[in-house]
């Protein structure tokens, strides 16, 4: 009996204890189990802005409770709570914290967390002066706050981590930050290139400031390049972020002087003269202006160095801009002579020289009386000259007429083809005659008229071409559209072709159609046929304009090729220039899209692949330029007009024999001066095309007249590095512009190098939009009077040439140097 009562007593006691220990279901602390990780939504708000937080609700919600840092959130004159939404007017840094929305419903409770940071802090790369003490206090405060919910790590200042790529010069201090939080406080560790990063892995070590979640590396060197990853973790989760560091070595190079400056001057006696010298140097340069003088009747001293007089040298308070200009006032005849701009740094010396010529002021002189005999001689000479010109004109006209006739009647086969097209021309004797006689060369029959009822060519009968079943497309399957462009005798129109794909006979394809204009000649017809046959022989490749078909029967000749909707590469690049960097500023200009460095390298890579394929087919382009590269809707580069190139089977060069108009600014020296064309002359043109790409459609040699280009190229001048171009790509251009053709790279080598560069180039490397306007070359015609480009600017650098005698150095710091011709 007693034992039964004892058992009953203990049962009642245990039941009461369990009921007392059961927590209240309304406590907000139990809204989320302590063992579960929590998702946190981050908000960055600038001081003074409106903060709005909205809670996600279920349909059966019964109550909503808002907390901040675990404390009940109360309404105030700035804080308004309306059920599932909280609004804070004119937010201040004190409003920062972890907000929680706790909802209760019959199905259970749910909590949504918001991390709010009210700050106007700068991004990580610019925020280097943090108050570590305040951060430490904040961290300690976080640790000591009671009743904190378990929270997986989260970023507290993601805006400071937006810049992922950091390119810094050598010897600079680098600081990467990963500001974060969580409950319990997370730990921080760093990886380099995916491996654990310890202080002894780096010369000089590094510092980690856990209070500010940052790593600091002093005096970085090229070996510090790599990917640095911060890992923040606690028992409820882990997050990471990667920074990329690129350390740029300072360029050890002597000063670079802009080509063409100072320039020669010819002035009148008593005038004022200004010489200018542009100097580019990474180490601080020392600039002097010198005048060459004579000593005892000699300009050269016993040491074989010229005698010079120092006219201007840098002082303590003199700026480089002041030193780049030399002013001479009220010049006399004694001021005439040679002047030199000498610039030196710790690496070496550079100099450019110019001549000053002083003339007497022009005076009006009385007209010289001419004798009757002198006048008679002038009249006879003028008459003889005019008669000679008339006779010469008649002879030239006769020769041209004879050439045109023999061109067609005796040599009508198309010279541009490796295999000539069989064309036969019928000459009708009379309208009544049923007989006709054929010309001696096998060509095509004429006599058909175009659909308009008029001859296709003025003065040329329409020719019937042999049908090629592989390429022939019925005319009723081709619908012509708007014109795309035209030349002197040909035009290109947009069209829709039905059934180009034999497997899909009803598919409609947008195409471009080449055709002749009404005033074209027999030569133009043969050229178009030649281009068509050349495209058949070349075959298909992704990076060339491919032949799709032709209409050769029952009407004019239509050559059907691929359509590139975005126009040529030059226009494509110019349309995507950043706003404000056009040469004639247009405030309404909106670029199509922003191009990254990888986009530009990809353009060059695709063109190189197309040229590699043409070279493998023994095809020399002769006119490779951005204007002859077309861009499709999918941004695929396609080389055009290669059908006009020459097919070579037995020799690997082509020597031009006619005097057609040539694009001289893209031509290699051997093509320009000796009229020799090879694959290596195409490589030179590819180097100019590279320069066009990285100047976003700039015009080569801006401000340089064509007549001066020959002299400049012979002297070894080359265009300078574009602003948006790496040193590696510029060296590729310079290799393409090597004076010796055999020393230039092949297209196969260019494809391999560009393929490697594309793989290493980041998609996030956008062009430098802060570059000054004059770093780009103008896209307008090269005239010195252009309002959009400066004729005084030069973009040339100079290849090293044999040394000239050196100047003695007259300040002590230049005592052992000399002048060398660049």
Swiss-Prot record:
Record note on what altering residue 768 to Y does: In HH2; the patient also carries a rare variant in FGF8
GO terms of biological process kind: angiogenesis; auditory receptor cell development; branching involved in salivary gland morphogenesis; calcium ion homeostasis; cardiac muscle cell proliferation; cell maturation; cell migration; cell projection assembly
Outcome, altering residue 795 to I: In HH2; also found in a family member with isolated anosmia
Consequence of substituting residue 346 to C: In HH2; also found in a family member with isolated anosmia
Activity regulation statement: Present in an inactive conformation in the absence of bound ligand. Ligand binding leads to dimerization and activation by sequential autophosphorylation on tyrosine residues. Inhibited by ARQ 069; this compound maintains the kinase in an inactive conformation and inhibits autophosphorylation. Inhibited by PD173074.
Ranges for domain Ig-like C2-type: 25-119, 158-246, 255-357
Name of a matching Pfam family: I-set
UniProt site positions, description: Breakpoint for translocation to form CNTRL-FGFR1 OR FGFR1-CNTRL fusion proteins: 428-429
Modification comment: Autophosphorylated. Binding of FGF family members together with heparan sulfate proteoglycan or heparin promotes receptor dimerization and autophosphorylation on tyrosine residues. Autophosphorylation occurs in trans between the two FGFR molecules present in the dimer and proceeds in a highly ordered manner. Initial autophosphorylation at Tyr-653 increases the kinase activity by a factor of 50 to 100. After this, Tyr-583 becomes phosphorylated, followed by phosphorylation of Tyr-463, Tyr-766, Tyr-583 and Tyr-585.
Entry-annotated residues carrying Phosphotyrosine: 463, 583, 585, 653-654, 730, 766
Keyword set, alphabetical order: ATP-binding, Cell membrane, Chromosomal rearrangement, Craniosynostosis, Cytoplasm, Cytoplasmic vesicle, Disease variant, Disulfide bond, Dwarfism, Glycoprotein, Heparin-binding, Holoprosencephaly, Hypogonadotropic hypogonadism, Immunoglobulin domain, Intellectual disability, Kallmann syndrome, Kinase, Membrane, Nucleotide-binding, Nucleus, Phosphoprotein, Receptor, Repeat, Signal, Transcription, Transcription regulation, Transferase, Transmembrane, Transmembrane helix, Tyrosine-protein kinase, Ubl conjugation
Effect of residue 653 to F: No effect on kinase activity. Loss of autophosphorylation and kinase activity
Cytoplasmic topological segments: 398-822
Region named Heparin-binding: 160-177
Effect of mutating residue 666 to R: In HH2; with cleft palate
Transmembrane segments annotated in the record for this chain: 377-397
Membrane topology: Single-pass type I membrane protein
Subunit structure, as described in the record: Monomer. Homodimer after ligand binding. Interacts predominantly with FGF1 and FGF2, but can also interact with FGF3, FGF4, FGF5, FGF6, FGF8, FGF10, FGF19, FGF21, FGF22 and FGF23 (in vitro). Ligand specificity is determined by tissue-specific expression of isoforms, and differences in the third Ig-like domain are crucial for ligand specificity. Affinity for fibroblast growth factors (FGFs) is increased by heparan sulfate glycosaminoglycans that function as coreceptors. Likewise, KLB increases the affinity for FGF19, FGF21 and FGF23.
UniProt comment concerning the protein's domains: The second and third Ig-like domains directly interact with fibroblast growth factors (FGF) and heparan sulfate proteoglycans. Isoforms lacking the first Ig-like domain have higher affinity for fibroblast growth factors (FGF) and heparan sulfate proteoglycans than isoforms with all three Ig-like domains.
Function recorded in the entry: Tyrosine-protein kinase that acts as a cell-surface receptor for fibroblast growth factors and plays an essential role in the regulation of embryonic development, cell proliferation, differentiation and migration. Required for normal mesoderm patterning and correct axial organization during embryonic development, normal skeletogenesis and normal development of the gonadotropin-releasing hormone (GnRH) neuronal system. Phosphorylates PLCG1, FRS2, GAB1 and SHB. Ligand binding leads to the activation of several signaling cascades.
Protein name: Fibroblast growth factor receptor 1
